[in-house]
């Protein structure tokens, strides 16, 4: 049986061994606590068809839970909007917030397995930073992850992936993600 106590995710070990030193050298940080690190990864699925069929949110939450390895939380409408036929507290999507080892494991699977399986993939956009060191991207189909069985998927759903870092600028965050081998186009 595998001993779980000594296990460290691959990207977490890489951060401790090589990424921190490279970032400190590149940006000239005086203190180790200034070095940017990953804070959390938020996965979000908005289910537009949930207005007509609320069961679709449940299946989306199950798929997101399989992808993340953690139970997804169903998100609800804050207020009613008649034009969209949305009522207050109606389930509209689901989300998962990953931290710690699960965050590093997910990022590893995203970079090495899921992104190369995206159709016509050349890389991710390098300009999707928010100005405060957080990176946002979207996937159009959930079955690029190996946890999702293609035959059991009823409907193709996309997802938003937000990678939050402690970096102060976009350049620092981009350098951090490049150290983790994130395939940026520019």
Curated annotation (Swiss-Prot):
Any single GO BP term: translation
GO cellular component: ribonucleoprotein complex; ribosome
Gene3D superfamilies with a match to the protein in the record: 3.30.1440.10
Record PROSITE patterns: RIBOSOMAL_L5
Keywords: Ribonucleoprotein, Ribosomal protein, RNA-binding, rRNA-binding, tRNA-binding
InterPro entries referenced in this protein's UniProt entry, alphabetically: Ribosomal_uL5 (IPR002132), Ribosomal_uL5_bac-type (IPR020930), Ribosomal_uL5_C (IPR031309), Ribosomal_uL5_CS (IPR020929), Ribosomal_uL5_dom_sf (IPR022803), Ribosomal_uL5_N (IPR031310)
Alphabetized GO MF terms: rRNA binding; structural constituent of ribosome; tRNA binding
Keyword 4Fe-4S carried by entry: no
Its job: This is one of the proteins that bind and probably mediate the attachment of the 5S RNA into the large ribosomal subunit, where it forms part of the central protuberance. In the 70S ribosome it contacts protein S13 of the 30S subunit (bridge B1b), connecting the 2 subunits; this bridge is implicated in subunit movement. Contacts the P site tRNA; the 5S rRNA and some of its associated proteins might help stabilize positioning of ribosome-bound tRNAs.
HAMAP family according to UniProt: Ribosomal_uL5_B
Cited NCBIfam families: PRK00010.1 (NF000585)
Subunit annotation: Part of the 50S ribosomal subunit; part of the 5S rRNA/L5/L18/L25 subcomplex. Contacts the 5S rRNA and the P site tRNA. Forms a bridge to the 30S subunit in the 70S ribosome.
Name of the protein described by the UniProt record: Large ribosomal subunit protein uL5
Organism this protein belongs to: Cereibacter sphaeroides (strain ATCC 17029 / ATH 2.4.9) (Rhodobacter sphaeroides)
């Amino acid at each position: 049986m595998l001993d779980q106590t000594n296990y460290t995710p691959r990207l977490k070990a890489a951060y401790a061994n090589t990424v921190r030193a490279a970032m400190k050298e590149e940006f000239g940080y005086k203190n180790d606590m200034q070095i940017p690190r990953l804070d959390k990864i938020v996965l979000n699925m908005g289910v537009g068809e949930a207005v007509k069929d609320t069961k679709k949110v449940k299946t989306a939450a199950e798929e997101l839970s399989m992808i993340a390895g953690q139970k997804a939380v169903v998100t609800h409408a804050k207020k009613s909007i008649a034009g969209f036929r949305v009522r207050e507290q109606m389930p509209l999507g689901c989300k998962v917030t990953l931290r710690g080892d699960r965050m590093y494991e997910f990022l590893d699977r995203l970079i090495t397995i899921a992104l190369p399986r995206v159709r016509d993939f050349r890389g991710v956009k390098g300009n999707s930073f928010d100005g405060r060191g957080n990176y946002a991207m979207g996937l159009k189909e959930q079955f690029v992850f190996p946890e999702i069985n293609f035959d059991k998927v009823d409907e193709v759903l996309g997802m938003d992936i937000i990678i939050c870092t402690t970096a102060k600028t976009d350049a620092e965050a981009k350098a951090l993600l490049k150290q983790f081998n994130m395939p940026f186009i520019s």
